[in-house]
């Protein structure tokens, strides 16, 4: 009631503010040197489309890219990129979505401190001083018609960059179709294929070539993937029949839920698999784990977890891993993995030694050490299976935890590593960023015939962090190739 009363008393002031907000925004935009934003990439139209979809939902004017372009060393394909003019009434909202901020008046936050959308989608973007790159305005945003896939007598090929590659891959695996992944780049008939490209051979399938073509075409519908038909296995680089192609097994995934498991993290994993990838997932309550036959599953995911209920299942989980299972542990679950001695991980610790902080400032000091949610840059090794399908050599990562894993002495065991100056957007204290520099958000540990995969950061945050969803998907399909 007090809020309504205050609004009534401020009625004229609020109405004036509402009336002038957009006109002031237009005036400010017209005077700015920044005239447009180009965003997108060269090989993943789906991710750029989903970002354009959000802009369109908020009635922000979006244009197509006039032609294939290279801007500041980054490639933008016409069919996978967009241009947003800044001289429009919602320019303030556009800036709120695309700007980065690393300096703040306060160090305490109610929620996360960074929302930068192009970083969360991991698309290239640039503020431009003209609208020269803009094509026609997109009045009705729609997914482009599927590209025709010619029937092949030898094999079908596609790169792994597309956002919906995991969905396509699982659909075919579920139909019993044999698929291989390329561990090294290669070229064939003038087309280059990156690490993690997929090959679907026509021979040795459980169906004839006509049915295989039909299944592939149906599975790819609406996913914005480029699939090519090849008639030969002779390539520049690795041959299609070489040992540098590994057969992918269909994952069977379980995720822990219940007491001790952070429900937000579990829900985000479930949402991603169910809504985006359409991969079935079994939710297992922590209290019921000892009654479950884990041999039914290839993967067990432990979202951020704290507590002691899992302790009674340690030997069961360890035995399952040793016989070929893959355990994926997120955030605080890493501490449980350490404590249970499933694996030994060196963690950096923060020594809280306050200097010059008075008693009445201690709460603010402690609060400032939290990482409520910020965006950080990493260098990645694109040849490692955890990074298959990621186009750039850097990857923005969302972090809202204070778990810092030491890098391995062997560089090839650090395929994702925080840079020397990692902060891209948001707040982090000097003490915490010193711990973050050079640490690693990912570790793969062999155990018997199985795998333990550790991730300090949430790759699926609030269903809009598209850029690192692929890291999670790669743990499902490529864990055995990380050994």
Predicted regions and their residues:
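Intrinsic-disorder/low-complexity accessory segments
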Residues: 1-483
């Amino acid at each position: 009631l007090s809020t309504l009363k205050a609004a009534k008393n401020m009625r004229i002031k609020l109405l004036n503010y509402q009336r002038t907000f957009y006109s002031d925004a237009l005036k400010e935009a017209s005077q700015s040197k920044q005239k447009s934003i180009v965003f997108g990439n060269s090989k993943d139209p789906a991710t750029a489309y989903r970002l354009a979809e959000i802009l369109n939902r908020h009635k922000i004017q979006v244009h197509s890219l006039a032609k294939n372009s290279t801007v500041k060393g980054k490639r933008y394909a016409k069919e996978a990129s967009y241009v947003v003019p800044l001289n429009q009434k919602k320019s303030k909202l556009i800036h709120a979505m695309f700007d980065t901020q690393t300096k703040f008046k306060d160090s305490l936050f109610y929620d996360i401190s960074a929302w930068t959308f192009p970083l969360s989608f991991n698309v290239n973007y640039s503020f431009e001083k003209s609208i020269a790159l803009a094509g026609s305005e997109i009045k009705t945003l729609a997914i482009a018609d599927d590209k025709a896939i010619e029937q092949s007598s030898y094999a079908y090929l596609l790169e792994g960059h597309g956002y919906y590659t995991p969905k396509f891959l699982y659909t075919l695996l579920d139909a019993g179709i044999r698929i291989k992944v390329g561990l090294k780049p290669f070229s064939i008939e003038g087309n280059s294929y990156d690490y993690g490209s997929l090959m679907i051979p026509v021979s040795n399938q459980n169906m004839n070539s006509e049915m295989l073509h039909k299944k592939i075409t149906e599975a790819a519908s609406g996913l914005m993937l480029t699939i090519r038909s090849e008639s030969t296995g002779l390539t520049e680089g690795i041959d299609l029949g070489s040992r540098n192609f590994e057969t992918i097994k269909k994952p069977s995934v379980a995720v822990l839920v219940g007491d001790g498991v952070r429900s937000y993290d579990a829900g985000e994993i479930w949402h991603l698999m169910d809504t985006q990838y359409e991969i079935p997932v079994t939710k297992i309550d922590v209290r019921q784990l000892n009654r479950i036959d884990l041999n039914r599953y290839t993967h067990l995911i432990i979202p951020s977890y704290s507590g002691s209920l899992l302790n009674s299942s340690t030997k069961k989980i360890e035995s399952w891993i040793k016989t070929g299972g893959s355990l994926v542990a997120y955030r605080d679950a890493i501490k449980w993995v350490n404590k249970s001695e499933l694996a030994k991980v060196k963690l950096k610790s923060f020594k809280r030694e306050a200097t010059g902080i008075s008693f009445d400032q201690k709460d603010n000091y402690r609060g400032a050490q939290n990482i409520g949610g910020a965006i950080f840059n990493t260098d990645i090794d694109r040849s490692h299976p955890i990074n298959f399908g990621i186009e750039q050599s850097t990857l923005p990562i969302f972090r809202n935890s204070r778990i810092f894993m030491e890098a391995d002495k062997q560089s090839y065991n650090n395929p994702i590593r925080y840079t020397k100056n990692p902060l891209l957007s948001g707040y982090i204290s000097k003490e915490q960023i010193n711990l973050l520099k050079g640490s690693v958000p990912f570790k793969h540990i062999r155990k018997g015939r199985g795998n333990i995969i550790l991730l300090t950061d949430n790759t699926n945050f609030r269903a809009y962090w598209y850029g690192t969803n692929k890291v999670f998907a790669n743990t499902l399909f490529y864990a055995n190739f990380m050994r």
